[in-house]
Amino acid sequence: MTETQSLELAKALISRPSVTPDDRDCQKLLVERLYKIGFAAEELHFGDTKNIWLRRGTKVPVVCFAGHTDVVPTGPVEKWDSPPFEPTERDGRLYGRGAADMKTSIACFVTACERFVAEHPDHQGSIALLITSDEEGDALDGTTKVVDVLKARGELIDYCIVGEPTAVDKLGDMIKNGRRGSLSGNLTVKGKQGHIAYPHLAINPVHTFAPALLELTQEVWDEGNKYFPPTSFQISNINGGTGATNVIPGELNVKFNFRFSTESTEAGLKQRVHAILDKHGVQYDLQWSCSGQPFLTQAGKLTDVARAAIAETCGIEAELSTTGGTSDGRFIKAIAKELIELGPSNATIHQINENVRLDDIPKLSAVYEGILARLLAGNAV
């Protein structure tokens, strides 16, 4: 493929150091491009976060691309082989922070829109973009707030493509059609501090928690299903003591996380954890935080259309998967009938020397255009 517009736009976006939640006028650049082909733009900024809702058309179905202009920090700049915010072509790849996650995806969808609208100026339905600068950070003032606004006025999405990097070995080999939920716990086990030579005068919270910890790690929370692996329980941090070797600690702090399937619920997991702790007589405080519920798009029109577009452009059959971390799809699913994630390789995201293959860039744009054509121009699947 010789199409170069996607590459040039990706470079323009990467060159803007939009470390979360700073947008650095990335969204302004997108608005300038899409305004020329009939998109209306609505700014929905909250705090330091910039959000934009772009839409062309007023009819249904609504096909929406969702993405984020913010990127994670670069890490030690001296470890990069080229400056992270100077997009560099090298060894058949485009290097730069945000190349994979996810400025290339945004660029590819914009250029796909430009070509599609040029060929189908009177297309069916509507095309929309939901872009935020707060996905890599706290994600409190970004997509979730925009979804609240759209939901309040009854503006729904029929088909949503989130441009997160999803490819494993080659472009198009994987589509995410769902994500696991994420539930975190911050547990404080209470004991009684004392001299280590007089354990009968103290209560060691490490010892009282140990049997409960064993049971928590061995518990089968669910068996998963055809779309989701079994729910996973993992300890992320555990800390207790004063640093001295002769003091029994007065408390133990344990941080843990569930990545849970649709076979489990937030309430059910909480109840089972409390039951195990109570069973072992643990004295504790436990604070919970759920950053996302599990969601699933059953195989249907959107997955069929995406797979057909991938097969046409990449010559491979895409696998449907729910593996990996959370994304803003967890918020958008509240107003989207069908939602998938589809983007470039995820092999170098958040890493030093983040990159994408140069020849994947025009292909990804063509895949997005193929999805639009099948959903809004009546092209056969």
UniProtKB/Swiss-Prot annotation:
NCBIfam families, per database record: dapE_proteo, PRK13009.1
Cofactor: Zn(2+); Co(2+)
Cofactor note: Binds 2 Zn(2+) or Co(2+) ions per subunit.
Binding site for Zn(2+) 1: H68, D101, E164
Membership in a protein family: Belongs to the peptidase M20A family. DapE subfamily.
Native organism: Neisseria meningitidis serogroup A / serotype 4A (strain DSM 15465 / Z2491)
Protein name listed in UniProt: Succinyl-diaminopimelate desuccinylase
GO aspect biological process, one term: diaminopimelate biosynthetic process
Lineage summary: Bacteria, Pseudomonadati, Pseudomonadota, Betaproteobacteria, Neisseriales
Molecular function as annotated in GO: acetylornithine deacetylase activity; cobalt ion binding; succinyl-diaminopimelate desuccinylase activity; zinc ion binding
